Amino acid sequence: MVRKIAAAAVAALFVPVVQAAGWEKLWTFEHGAGTSVAGQTSEILAFDSLNNELWVAGLKGVDILNAATGSFVQHIDTTAFGELNSVAIRNGVAAFAIAAPIKTDAGSVLTFDTTSRSFQQSYLVGALPDMVTFTADGRIMTANEGEPLARPGFATVEARGSISIIDTTKDSVTTLGFSGYDGTTGLGRIVSPGAKPSIDWEPEYIALSKDGQFAMVTLQEANAVAKIDLMSQQIVSVTSLGLKDHSLPGNELDTTDRDITSPRTSIAGNYRNAPVFGMYMPDAIASYASGGKTYYITANEGDSRNLTDFVDGEFNEEVRVGSSSYVLDPTAFPDAAALKADSNLGRLTVTTSGGDLDGDGDYDQIHVFGGRSFSILDENGNQVFDSGNQLEALLFADPALRALIDDGRSDNKGVEPEGVTVLELGDRTLAFIGFERTFDSVIAIYDVTNPTAATFVDFIVDAESNAVEGLTAYEFGGRYFLATANEGTGTTSLFSITPVPEPETYAMLLAGLGLIGLAARRRRS
């Protein structure tokens, strides 16, 4: 069905809009049912261009799907090795990132031939490899999260976050840690009390520069990114992503989950500025080139640390503003009592590991998890663009889409942008940002060709799926595709992406000219 987003509603948001692509859903495959293995899920996926297949990583291993038809081809069981977290493919080789049964032990990377689907080699890497990718020259990289292990009755076992680089031609593994940053301050957030970067920082996701010289790694809980020199195989910098000022116009947010009228009725539209700061805390990261330079796109999901250990005690950095244990500084917040009301900021989930600027035990700033946005960073990790509150505000501005917003997450991290991938479509570069917390699967499409002025294109909405976890976009046979792994429904979906030769239009200009009928077209499954 072809439908139009009301231009007047979009124009009111002063959001640039460009129509550069159309989309159509081709198929959805349900894992764990029929020909698939019982209990299998869909979390991360990779495309094999040699065989036109999608390899989908889930709880039980990898399901291989025929990309042309969406039919099941084969299952590779990885449960004997540990927990499968990620899959990547390059030139007929698939790499699996697998956490050890005890997650603080060394993890492993397994490689397979994508044509014969036979096992090739195994490599030991750092603790809890959460993401795997290939470099331009064929090396394999893993982001090893190194989460601590907390179990009732046992002392907490610490692990070290790291990045591993595998040279398969030499069967060598180089693992990089953060001990060189233990004497530094201000580069990345420290969550656990008294911890050092070498223990506290947890690499999450990797993207590669377009010249193949560098990698950028998200350190989600630390609210930072690390830059890796792939030639010297060294960490060359760690850059804090700073804080998002939600008191500024364009950064409005919904702070309460108490304005729903029924389970599927969305927010009442109470987006507003508030005296809080968001920690961007990106999960996924992707890269692209513009003007001869590399830029990185981050999905600013947010994350917190919560450990339950009956020997060492419990650590949970989450608290609501309205909690009596969360004391606001009376000078910074003379209206603290009003702010703590549930109708104001009282329901908002914040961190206890930041905001006490003078160390006196009360909070001079309110820090929330995630940016509820995507950002574009330059080659050194400096922000050149942030989508502000567009991802949620654009959904709400469309009467046909606002019911997809789960108001029960407003007090947490909103729609939680988690996954991101990019696609070069002619002379344009499109970014696809997947939301984890909407009732149906929602993916925002932005034209990011100009990295300092990204423009909204469309929403992809899939009523058969929800909780988009992984995305990959690719070209095959002269056509363009987007594949999504939908964790909530255990499904994988494939969409065709089609260029639309339409000149750029800006919402502010539309409002000024009164062209309220002009809108971004979209198809909805």
Residue ranges of each PLM-predicted region?
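Short, charged juxtamembrane terminal tails flanking transmembrane helices
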Residues: 522-525
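Sec-dependent N-terminal signal peptides
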Residues: 5-13, 510-511
